[in-house]
Amino acid sequence: MKFAIVITLLLVAFSAVALADKSIERAVMDLITARDDDCGKLFADCTSDSDCCENWVCSKTGFVKNICKYNFG
């Protein structure tokens, strides 16, 4: 029984370290990647994709046009 508890605790600790590593990596990449403060986020007016933030696109079709939306693809 003690062996199973020790293995479970080791598994939990390893998982926590792995998740923290990914979180730290994303935080570092945010610092490295230069972001334009003037870029458009959700519902910001746009005329082209360059008006929107990174990974966001200018909606050209649908009910609402010429707004920035996140690119899921």
Curated annotation (Swiss-Prot):
It is found in: Secreted. The modification Phenylalanine amide is found at F72. It comes from Heteropoda venatoria. The presence of a 'disulfide through disulfide knot' structurally defines this protein as a knottin. This is Mu-sparatoxin-Hv2. Residues 21-35 form a propeptide. Expressed by the venom gland. Disulfide bonds join C39-C53, C46-C58, C52-C68.
